[in-house]
Amino acid sequence: MAPTRDEQHWMYRNMVTSRRFEETIAKIYFEGKSPAFNMANGPIPGEMHLSDGQEPVAVGVCAHLTPEDVVTATHRPHHRAIAKGVDLDKMAAEIFGKATGLSGGRGGHMHLFDADVNFACSGIIAQGMGPAVGAALSRKMQGKPGVAVAFVGEGAVNQ
C-alpha cells in the first residue's frame, strides 16, 4: 500500500530534519578540532560518527513502526533516533554532554537512550541485535503486539 500524502510529508520532513541536524552537529563538532582530530578540543566531547545519505533507510523503516515498537542502533544513531521520535533538544543536549540530555550528558552521541520512544543505541558494533531479540521475545511472551528492529551496518553482519 502506498503511503498517504500526510505520511509522505512526515517522511520528507523527517529526512530533511535528520540531514540538517547532522550537518549542524558536524559543523559544530569540527570547530576547534585539529587536523590530528584532537578529540579533547571543541564543544562536543569524544568522537562523532555521521551517516549522511542514510536518512531514507531510517525513515522508511520507522514509518511502519508503532510507538510500542523497539529500535536499537549502533554508533551512527542520529537518523534512526530522529525517525523513532527521540526529542531533538534532549538528543542535542546529550551530544553536547549537558545534564539535560537523555542520559544526563554521560552517554554522548553513541549511547543515546530514550525509553519514552523505545530507542537505544550503543557504540559497540552489532550490540543492538541481542537487545532487539530480547525485546521481541519479551513482547511475545507477554502477549503484547509489536516488533523490534536492530539497525546494523555492513561491518556488523558477520558478527
Model-derived regions, located:
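Cofactor-binding active-site loop characterized by glycine-rich and histidine/acidic residues
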Residues: 35-159
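Cofactor-/ligand-binding subdomain signature composed of acidic, glycine-rich
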Residues: 1-46, 52, 67
